[in-house]
Amino acid sequence: MPKKTEQPVSFESSLNELEKIVTRLESGELPLDDALNEFEHGIQLARQGQQKLQQAEQRVQILLSDDPDAPLSPFTPDNDTL
């Protein structure tokens, strides 16, 4: 059976979910396994958010550039950024 493809989540939704994860982790009430799972999900959300911000910054720079024909190119984040 094929996996469901996830719908793209907005930056704001990801940030909201990340804030909830941080609150749960800071409470100190999660069992270790749950805390590790939450942490892993939080890292994924943070990386996705950083990628979206970098893509938005690239678009703004192109829009503000003097070259009206400057192409948008796909962004590939470095794994060392977080």
Swiss-Prot record:
It catalyses: Exonucleolytic cleavage in either 5'- to 3'- or 3'- to 5'-direction to yield nucleoside 5'-phosphates. It is found in: Cytoplasm. One of its GO terms (molecular function) is exodeoxyribonuclease VII activity. GO terms for cellular component: cytosol; exodeoxyribonuclease VII complex. Its EC number is 3.1.11.6. Bidirectionally degrades single-stranded DNA into large acid-insoluble oligonucleotides, which are then degraded further into small acid-soluble oligonucleotides. PANTHER family: EXODEOXYRIBONUCLEASE 7 SMALL SUBUNIT. Heterooligomer composed of large and small subunits. This is Exodeoxyribonuclease 7 small subunit. It comes from Pectobacterium atrosepticum (strain SCRI 1043 / ATCC BAA-672) (Erwinia carotovora subsp. atroseptica). The gene is xseB.
